Swiss-Prot record:
Gene Ontology BP term (one): cellulose biosynthetic process
Pathway: Glycan metabolism; bacterial cellulose biosynthesis; Purine metabolism; 3',5'-cyclic di-GMP biosynthesis
Cofactor: Mg(2+)
An MF annotation (GO) of this entry: metal ion binding
Biological source species: Salmonella choleraesuis (strain SC-B67)
Stated name of the protein: Probable diguanylate cyclase DgcQ
Topological relation to the membrane, as annotated: Multi-pass membrane protein
Gene Ontology CC entries for this record: plasma membrane
Enzyme kind, highest EC tier: transferase
UniProt keyword rRNA processing, yes or no: no
Length: 570
């Protein structure tokens, strides 16, 4: 193995190039390309995600707006009826029919149940219970001084409620329930004990009790979910209720029942063109009221954990979206209903939709690009590795002697010149040994050139194993070698040369199958400390001259001076 001293003053670029070879450069470039392609794909995914969320909100918003407008129409009607009653309380009409109704009330108020009706074709009947029934609870009272005005106002409400009925409305029933023991409803009641049970059912409902001044100080519309068993089909309903007040006195409650079936039918009609997703309507306690799923299909209901997560998000904003497992749920609060409308979009629907197709295509493109990139990386990495190996091999062949595996003459002179310059600047010793194998020509003549090659290779191995780690050695001629000893004085160089001479002389070489041969070497030594000259060619020339003196003096010896002061060892 050749020995080489690493120079401390090598540039940072060469050190970096030595640490990061072509393979590292290729790896880094491909890693950067893959990183940027992944970031670009991720950016596209984020844009696609935002577009998907916006699409979900747009679909939900369109249905929510239609439902909200329909509910607003019903709420406006309820407020209109409340305002009409309020005006009738403040300025009652002086019609004889109304006065006659008041008189009839005074006559019938003690009855267990009673009914007042002005005109069956134009107004709705008024139903009531006895004074004794009203006196049973503190919630009800007939002590109002405006009882007569409330009675006539309720009869006027019957006229308005009949006129305001429309097939486009969602409501099943509109009613006014008074704290004074009577009620009016768009659904007729058979005359009899059903009047008492129905009034009792009304005044015990949450939508009536919760409208007291203490429980509803804002006096606005409130929504309630209830099942009313007296209805023939016993269907589930939501009820909007609005209190009637005047001069800080609570007269009663105007209410409107909306069947859940009507809301379901409306949702299905509104979402019939939207083949993806399912709409669900929840009340203010996140209880499912209805959904747009077909009758033969099971709704995608939320479990308790998902409902809790959704409730936490709804508290933060009036609309938004949330990923719950394989479902994406977008939600929006309704302006005219105390609840929230949800759109549930499953993963399967998402994959089958437009955004799913785009996502799959984008994923396949990224996978294809990444696969091509990895294949290209492997091919180029293999090519670069082979080229790097070939380059190193060619460089090694250009700098080394293939037989002895030491530096050739050109490489040795180049490296030695750089070392000499460095040690001259550092004012450190620098020595050179010139070595020649004795009688080498006779080995070629007697045993052939193959034997000569074995001798050269054997001698080079002994030289390389004897010199120090930072010394360098090279073959400069046929059987001639040069050894550069940076940092070695002339005395140290002489010791090293002596070790080399002894090892070469002591080892026998097998030149043929049955013949061994012992060789010797003559050496000349020069050192920069003699004349202060660090020019390598001059030092090598001086060592070569002293090598000639050693051969003239009998071979197998070392010459370290110009004439007679050579040291001889046998």
């Amino acid at each position: 193995m050749p020995h080489e001293t690493l120079l401390d003053n090598q540039g940072w670029f060469k050190k970096l190039a030595r640490r990061f070879g072509p393979g590292h450069v290729v790896n880094t470039c491909f890693l950067i390309v893959m990183l940027f392609s992944t970031l670009l794909t991720w950016r596209e995914v984020m844009i696609l995600k935002d577009a998907y969320v916006a699409s979900q909100r747009n679909h939900l918003g369109s249905v929510a707006n239609v439902l909200d407008r329909q509910l607003q129409f019903n709420m406006d009607r309820l407020i209109f009826l409340r305002n009409g009653m309020h005006e009738a309380l403040v300025a009652p009409l002086a019609f004889s029919a109304l006065q006659s109704a008041v008189t009839q009330f005074e006559q019938r108020r003690v009855r267990h149940f009673w009914q007042l009706e002005l005109d069956k074709r134009r107004t709705l009947p008024l139903y009531g219970v006895s004074d004794q029934f009203v006196a049973r609870t503190t919630l009800l009272s007939r002590e109002s001084r405006d009882l007569a005005n409330e009675l006539t106002a309720t009869l006027e409400l019957g006229y308005l409620a009949r006129l305001a009925r429309s097939s486009a409305m969602l409501t099943l029933e509109t009613m006014y329930v008074s704290c004074s023991g009577f009620y009016l409803s768009t659904l007729p009641t058979a005359y009899g004990s059903d009047i008492v049970s129905r009034y009792y059912q009304y005044v015990t409902q949450p939508w009536f009790i919760e409208q007291s001044q203490r429980r509803n100080p804002q006096r606005g519309v409130r929504w309630f979910t209830s099942a009313q068993p007296y209805v023939a089909d016993e269907q589930k309903k939501v009820t909007a209720s609005l209190p009637l007040d005047h001069d800080n006195y609570w007269y009663g409650v105007l209410a409107m029942d909306i069947p859940v079936a009507s809301l379901q039918r409306f949702l299905r009609d509104a979402a019939e063109k939207d083949i993806e997703g399912e709409y669900q309507l929840y009340d203010n306690h996140l209880r499912l009221l209805t959904d747009s799923a077909p009758e033969q299909q099971t709704a995608n209901t939320l479990n308790d954990r998902e409902r809790a997560l959704l409730a936490r998000e709804i508290e933060k904003d009036t609309l938004g979206g949330l990923r719950l497992g394989t479902h994406y749920v977008s939600w929006e609060r309704l302006d005219h209903f105390d609840g929230v409308l949800l759109r549930v979009h499953t993963l399967r629907e998402g994959i089958q939709g437009n955004f799913g197709s785009i996502s799959i295509a984008l994923t396949l493109l990224w996978v294809l690009f990444t696969a091509m990139l990895l294949i290209s990386w492997g091919v180029i990495r293999h090519m670069v590795k082979n080229m790097f190996v070939l380059q190193n091999s060619l460089q090694w062949q250009a700098w080394h002697d293939p037989l002895t595996r030491l530096y050739n003459r050109g490489a040795l002179f180049e490296k030695a010149s750089r070392l000499a310059k460095r040690y001259r600047e550092a004012r450190q010793p620098f020595s050179v040994i010139q070595l020649d194998l004795d009688y080498f020509k006779s080995v070629n003549d007697r045993f052939g050139h193959q034997a000569g090659d074995r001798v050269l290779s054997h001698a080079a191995g002994l030289i390389g194993s004897t010199i120090r780690a930072h010394d360098i050695a090279g073959r400069v001629g046929g059987e001639e070698f040069c050894i550069v000893l940076p940092g070695a004085t002339k005395a140290q160089a002489l010791q090293i040369a002596e070790r080399i001479r002894q090892r070469i002389n002591d080892k026998e070489i097998l030149v043929t199958k049955s013949t061994t041969l012992r060789i010797s070497a003559s050496m000349g030594i020069s050192s920069a400390e003699e004349y202060g000259d660090y020019d390598f060619e001059q030092l090598q020339s001086l060592a070569d001259k002293r090598l000639y003196y050693a051969k003239q003096s009998g071979r197998n010896r070392i010459c370290a001076s110009d004439a007679t002061q050579e040291r001889e060892k046998k």
